[in-house]
């Protein structure tokens, strides 16, 4: 089996929910592979989005590019529907004035069908997520 970016639209991955949406910066931008696009929050926190893999995957490493995110919680589930999430990772990110935050998370027990990313707090009224990549393997397709 080959390792791939499981969060790529070419792998069939989708953002199926986001708590805020700006028509110029929609949540799909997180996984479109374009470094010029991003999703932005619309103020109030927490904000969240859910990524659906449409298959069972094993994530070995996550790389998140964001701006002004203070605390990020990531939850996962192996359910066929986006239910029964369990907390997986919670990180306080470092504020990087004028540049993107690059957070690399080496995953343990990274089995999932959905990931929920919760921006618990931010360094400003708005925050953005520019990209998420997940290095790993497809375990099986969903029945």
Swiss-Prot record:
Matching InterPro entries: FA58C, Galactose-bd-like_sf, IFT25
GO terms classed as biological process: cell differentiation; cilium assembly; heart development; intraciliary anterograde transport; intraciliary transport; kidney development; left/right axis specification; lung development
Subcellular location: Cell projection, Cilium
Keyword annotations: Calcium, Cell projection, Cilium, Differentiation, Metal-binding, Protein transport, Spermatogenesis, Stress response, Transport
Binding site for Ca(2+): 29, 32, 37
One cellular-component annotation, GO: centrosome
Tissue: Expressed predominantly in the testis (at protein level).
UniProt similarity note: Belongs to the IFT25 family.
Protein purpose: Component of the IFT complex B required for sonic hedgehog/SHH signaling. May mediate transport of SHH components: required for the export of SMO and PTCH1 receptors out of the cilium and the accumulation of GLI2 at the ciliary tip in response to activation of the SHH pathway, suggesting it is involved in the dynamic transport of SHH signaling molecules within the cilium. Not required for ciliary assembly. Its role in intraflagellar transport is mainly seen in tissues rich in ciliated cells such as kidney and testis. Essential for male fertility, spermiogenesis and sperm flagella formation.
Protein name: Intraflagellar transport protein 25 homolog
Taxonomic lineage of the native organism: Eukaryota, Metazoa, Chordata, Craniata, Vertebrata
């Amino acid at each position: 089996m080959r390792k791939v970016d499981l969060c790529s639209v070419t792998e069939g991955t989708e953002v199926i929910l986001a708590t805020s949406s700006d028509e110029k910066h929609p949540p799909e931008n997180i996984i479109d592979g374009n470094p010029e696009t991003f999703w932005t929050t619309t103020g109030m926190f927490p904000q969240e989005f859910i990524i659906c893999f449409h298959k069972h995957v094993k994530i070995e490493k996550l790389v998140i590019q964001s701006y002004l995110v203070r605390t990020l919680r990531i939850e996962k589930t192996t359910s066929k529907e986006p239910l029964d999430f369990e907390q997986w990772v919670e990180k306080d990110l470092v504020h990087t004035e004028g540049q993107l935050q690059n957070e690399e998370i080496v995953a343990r027990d990274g089995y999932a069908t959905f990931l929920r990313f919760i921006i618990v707090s931010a360094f400003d009224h708005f925050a953005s997520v520019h990209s998420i990549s997940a290095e790993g393997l497809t375990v099986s397709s969903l029945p």
